[in-house]
UniProtKB/Swiss-Prot annotation:
High-level lineage: Bacteria, Pseudomonadati, Pseudomonadota, Gammaproteobacteria, Enterobacterales
Key word rRNA processing present: no
Entries under SUPFAM superfamilies matching the protein: MetI-like
Protein known as: Putative 2-aminoethylphosphonate transport system permease protein PhnU
Record GO biological process: 2-aminoethylphosphonate transport; transmembrane transport
Transmembrane segments: 19-39, 76-96, 111-131, 150-170, 202-222, 254-274
Species in which this protein is naturally found: Salmonella typhi
Keywords linked to the UniProt accession: Cell inner membrane, Cell membrane, Membrane, Transmembrane, Transmembrane helix, Transport
This protein's record includes keyword Cell cycle: no
Gene from which the chain derives: phnU
Domain ABC transmembrane type-1: 68-275
Amino acid sequence: MSLILPLEKPALNLRPLLWLLLPLLALATLFFWPLSLIVEQALRGANGEIGLETFRQVVDSKRFVGALLNTLQIAFFATAGCLLLGSVMSLILVFIPFPGSELIGRVVDTFIALPTFLITLAFTFIYGSAGLLNGALMSLFAFELPPVDFLYSMQGVILAEITVFTPLVMRPLMAALRQIDKSQLEAASILGAHPLRVIGQVIFPAALPALMASGSLCLLLTTNEFGIVLFIGAKGVNTLPMMVYSKAILESDYTVACMIALINIVLSLGLFSLYRLAASRTGVRSQPC
C-alpha cells in the first residue's frame, strides 16, 4: 500500500521584492516626493485652488518667452559646437597621432572633473574687461575701452559651455573611433577614396551611436546649465534656470518659480524623447557616455 504524501508549497521568497523595494523607496523619497511638492506648488493658485492660473500667467509673460528662446538657442548652438569641435579633435587625436597627443587626451579627461565655475573664472581672467587679452590690446594699441567684450553676451555663454562640455563628446567618441577596423580605412585609402568620403562612409556610421549619446547629454546639460550663466553675468541673457533662481531667491515668488521649474523639466524630458525617437529611427542603440 503506497502512501501519498501531501505536496509542500515552496516558501515564498521575499528577498527579490525586498531588493526591489529599497531602491524604489529611496527613489520615491529623494525624487518623486520633492517633485510632487513642486508640482503641487506650481498648480496651486493665489486662491489656494489647484488650476492652471499660474501656467497661463507664466506663458503670457514676455520675460518667460525670452528666457525660453534664450535657453533653446544657447543649448542648440552649444551642443552643435561641442559636436563639431569634439569630432575634429577626436579625429586628430585618434587618427593623426603626434608627440603629446596622449597628454592632451588625459587633459581632456581631467576637464570632465573640473567644476564649471572654474572654467568660467579662467574665461574671465583671459577675455574679461580687465582680462589678459584686453589688457594687452589696450597697452599695444592705446584703446580707451576694452575692445573684446563678447564674454558678457550670449556668445560668451555659448563659448564657455562649448569649452566645458566638449570633453563629454570626445571621451565616448574617441573610444568608438579606436574600435574601427583599420583595414577598412587602409582599403579605402588604397582605392583612392577622398578623406571626406572615408569620414562620411566609414568613420561616421561607426561613430554615430557615440555622437547621438554624447550630443543628447550635452543638449540636456546646456538646457539646464545655471552656474556658467550666473558666473559670467551676461547682460540681457536670461534662461529658464536663471529665471527660477531670480523668482525664488530674489523675488520670493515660489509658485511662479515652481511652475517655471516644472516647464523646464518637461522641456528636458521632451528633448530627451526627441533623442530617443531619432535614435530609434536611425537604428542607433543608446550608449552610456
